[in-house]
Amino acid sequence: MTTTLQQRESASLWEQFCQWVTSTNNRIYVGWFGTLMIPTLLTATTCFIIAFIAAPPVDIDGIREPVAGSLLYGNNIISGAVVPSSNAIGLHFYPIWEAASLDEWLYNGGPYQLVVFHFLIGIFCYMGRQWELSYRLGMRPWICVAYSAPVSAATAVFLIYPIGQGSFSDGMPLGISGTFNFMIVFQAEHNILMHPFHMLGVAGVFGGSLFSAMHGSLVTSSLVRETTEVESQNYGYKFGQEEETYNIVAAHGYFGRLIFQYASFNNSRSLHFFLGAWPVIGIWFTAMGVSTMAFNLNGFNFNQSILDSQGRVIGTWADVLNRANIGFEVMHERNAHNFPLDLASGEQAPVALTAPAVNG
């Protein structure tokens, strides 16, 4: 008997790299999108940590009044933030090499642009990597579609909104109290709470939380016992098994009796599509709302108070909301503007600024 041995052709270094990048046997899948995601997210994370701890004050309003955001300049975890780049920079791309010195770059808030741009590229690539891994494994592509909701929301507040407002100084600060400040100012300038797209987003997030809790509790309460009473139910299941872990008929029957029959799903695919689509569509709408308000297509406003036949104001909840928004706007950039833009321009409009008399 004759045995023929043929030497295996050695793959080039590039081919080995390609096989490693696209291999689904790695503990963590890299993928071609990952080759860009990993360095950009590492860069954004590193710069964010350094800036959050030690960045000097930033002239955010462009009026030579720097705002300190780092821990070493007196902030704590709650009040600290990476302060957005200066209004003097506007929408200009401001990498380190565009500044005359590192001190100038820090003073004008260069780290904010560095973090935001690398972060956005990183999460875009993470979404692409989700699609790539699904493709390699023969899965359907809906995971990356669902992830597009938070990606679109981040893009709206970090990129679209500053573009619409004309300056990256209007972007969301990278910190806890900075995020709240951004929300309050957004309400003051755009009346976002009265925008229907934001209302859909609230319904999506809160509704998604409710449906998630309902689904999780129903499934956990209707597990099929495959073990004896003295063993843990966990021993009755294995990852990837073909059999159902829980009894959807029992869950459907329980929920149908708790509310009414047609409030419950009896089809697992329809149920899980609903659980995925509800919050995703809601967050998509919120991102679209922020993106349109970026160009000042704002929420509903009721700036004209209701008047009686004598010209007296009939107070409504809209008047309370208007007064709150004006108060927010007065506090915002108080050294850059003498008055809120609503009060400083245009014809005078009757607004209820007097409290009704309380008899009692």
Swiss-Prot record:
Catalyzed chemical reaction(s): 2 a plastoquinone + 4 hnu + 2 H2O = 2 a plastoquinol + O2
Enzyme class per UniProt: oxidoreductase
One MF annotation (Gene Ontology) recorded for this entry: oxygen evolving activity
Ranges facing Lumenal, thylakoid side: 54-110, 162-191, 296-360
UniProt-listed CDD domains: Photosystem-II_D1
Gene Ontology biological process: photosynthetic electron transport in photosystem II; response to herbicide
InterPro entries: D1/D2 (IPR055266), Photo_II_D1/D2_sf (IPR036854), Photo_RC_L/M (IPR000484), Photo_RC_L/M_CS (IPR055265), PSII_D1 (IPR005867)
Site (Tyrosine radical intermediate) residue list: 161
Impact noted for substituting residue 238 to V: Weak herbicide resistance
Topology versus the membrane: Multi-pass membrane protein
Cofactor note: The D1/D2 heterodimer binds P680, chlorophylls that are the primary electron donor of PSII, and subsequent electron acceptors. It shares a non-heme iron and each subunit binds pheophytin, quinone, additional chlorophylls, carotenoids and lipids. D1 provides most of the ligands for the Mn4-Ca-O5 cluster of the oxygen-evolving complex (OEC). There is also a Cl(-1) ion associated with D1 and D2, which is required for oxygen evolution. The PSII complex binds additional chlorophylls, carotenoids and specific lipids.
Binding of chlorophyll a ChlzD1, residues: 118
Binding site for Fe cation: 215, 272
Post-translational modification: C-terminally processed by CtpA; processing is essential to allow assembly of the oxygen-evolving complex and photosynthetic growth. Tyr-161 forms a radical intermediate that is referred to as redox-active TyrZ, YZ or Y-Z.
Family: Belongs to the reaction center PufL/M/PsbA/D family.
Name under which the protein is recorded: Photosystem II protein D1 2
Gene name linked to the record: psbA2
